[in-house]
Structure formats: C-alpha cells, structure tokens
Amino acid sequence: MKYLKKLFTLLVIALFACGFAACSSDDDEPEEPSLEVTAANLHGTWELAEWNGEPLAEGTYCYIVLNRKDQTFEMYQKFDSMYGRHITGSFAIKNDPYQGYIISGSYDNGMGDWNQSYFVTRLLASGSMIWTAKDDVTDISRYKRCDEVPAEILKECKDLTEE
C-alpha cells in the first residue's frame, strides 16, 4: 500500500509536468518571413508610418510611389516646407552579400543624389518595410503599403507649372 501511494504521487507529478509543458510559449505565431528586396516587391505606393520609432508630427507626411518597370519614384512629402512637394527621380537596388539589400536614388532636374542610401529590411507581404540609413543606423523609417496617395495630398503637391 505504501508503494501504491508513492506510485500514485509520482503519477500525479508526471501529469502536472506534462500539463505545464503543453502550456509553454512555443505556440506563439511564427514570424512572417521577409520578401526578397526587388523592384517588383517594392512596386507600389508606400506611406511613411514611423520615423525613428515615432509617428510623424501632425501636418507632415511622406508618400513614395515606386515604379518597378523603369525604377523611378514619385515622392509627395511635407517635412521641411509649409507646402507639400512633389519630387521625382530614379532608384537602384543593390544586394551586398555582407550588408544586405541597399536602395539608393537620384532626383530629377539635376537635384543630385539622395542624401543617404538605405538598408531595406523586413519587407513583408502584409505590407510594411524598414529603411535604415546606411551612414546613420539611428535613422530608421517604417513604411506601410497603401492603395494610393490621397487626393488632397496630390492636389497640395501639384506642380505650379501644371496649373
């Protein structure tokens, strides 16, 4: 009888141990895999959602429309001016075997190259990506995919020559 009590106690302990193991945190949802950074995967309209971990200040915005066919972009932004601006240019993607995917670009109308090249990471099929400045890893931008640039922003950024 004494051995049966010990056996029963061990059996109860074993059942509790199995119960706790079944409730472990290994059931977390798997992380969404990143897509390859190609012009085709970047194609479309992107809104700057966060800059350095913070949402954009009220009244500021940045939308970038990337065209995969000819690797051009149109940017609609309002950061450093009281008016929105429409900026165009071209971009290039390079896959560095040591650093990863890097996007760089140049502006049309002789305005020069982008101030920075950016590491592109966490490009997700669900519609977001991270750009980190190559020469300043504290400069981090999170973009989210959107259907289109809002009409009021297109109107605000319309070139004066188009009116």
Annotate each predicted stretch with a short phrase.
Residues G44-Q71, S104-W114:
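Short, solvent-exposed loop/hinge segments that bridge or flank secondary-structure elements
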Residues M1-A22:
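Sec-dependent bacterial lipoprotein signal peptides
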Residues F16-N41, C146-E163:
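Bacterial Sec-dependent N-terminal signal peptides
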Residues G100-E163:
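Beta-sheet ligand-binding and adhesion/scaffold domains
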Residues W51, Y76-D80, D96, S106, ...:
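Surface loops and adjacent helix of pleckstrin homology
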Residues N41-E47, D70-E74, P97-S104, A125-I130:
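Short, hydrophobic/aromatic-rich segments at coil-to-beta transitions
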Residues L56-I102:
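N-terminal glycine/threonine-rich, aromatic-flanked beta-hairpin/loop signature
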